[in-house]
Amino acid sequence: MAFVTRQFVRSMSSSSSASAAAKKILIKHVTVIGGGLMGAGIAQVAAATGHTVVLVDQTEDILAKSKKGIEESLKRMAKKKFTENPKAADEFVEKTLSSLSTSTDAASVVHSTDLVVEAIVENLKLKNELFQRLDKFAAEHTIFASNTSSLQITNIANATTRQDRFAGLHFFNPVPMMKLVEVIKTPMTSQKTFESLVDFCKTLGKHPVSCKDTPGFIVNRLLVPYLIEAIRLHERGDASKEDIDTAMKLGAGYPMGPFELLDYVGLDTTKFILDGWHEMDPENPLFQPSPSMNNLVAQKKLGKKTGEGFYKYK
């Protein structure tokens, strides 16, 4: 009897697993909206792992620049990957680029795609308008995902009729190098959608982690308050920014100090994230604005990209 029971349980478990697996969407065709650093990086890793990819942006000039950047990045990667075999390196680059096409008309390409990943500017109105439009043209099974790092996924998903097929896919820059992807599940995201996206991330060679639709998700929710607290420590005159950076590198083992990292990321980017959180929860002490950062942003001293932030760069 025990043997029969065990066999029955195994059979039911196996059938249940097979049924769940059958429900998941195998993502083969990917449409990436936004040809900036993040969008181009996502398109690159998807194409390099055997997916058919369409990269979409507003103009052919932007797309040409994006594709050139992808090609250069692929050549660098191939040179390291195939150090003893230049022919294999060339074939890798050629094969990847053959899987990647571009378009300026998102509506015309989403009808046959399995996944749409949005990586445009951090503006809720623009994201809502984009997804609302694409929702009318995309296939029934198509999953929508946003790469936002600061906006709530639920607020973006609500612009569509497919909240159950909507989630967050937060990649990290530079996408080809960074292994982590945060998969954000809203209260409406179906388990089928979530599992399909987790599997997709794994096919990219990434390590997916799951998080609810909370401000900042995991990494930014921990990282941004740390960066702002470093600024406050400096604002109070407790320590110089140089000593704070040195302490965190030598004492905590961080590769960059908080002020170095702020300048690298861009002060405008950090301010945008913090302002959004402060608007959502104005009483939270972790989300209070930073006067010195606001002052630097007002002066257009945004970090390395402008030549000056908390530090000056040649």
Swiss-Prot record:
EC number(s) given by UniProt: 1.1.1.35
Transit peptide endpoints, chain numbering: 1-12
GO biological processes: cell differentiation; fatty acid beta-oxidation; negative regulation of insulin secretion; positive regulation of cold-induced thermogenesis; regulation of insulin secretion; response to activity; response to hormone; response to insulin
PROSITE patterns: 3HCDH
Pathway the protein contributes to: Lipid metabolism; fatty acid beta-oxidation
Subunit-level organization: Homodimer. Interacts with GLUD1; this interaction inhibits the activation of glutamate dehydrogenase 1 (GLUD1).
Name of the protein this chain belongs to: Hydroxyacyl-coenzyme A dehydrogenase, mitochondrial
Species of provenance: Rattus norvegicus (Rat)
Gene: Hadh
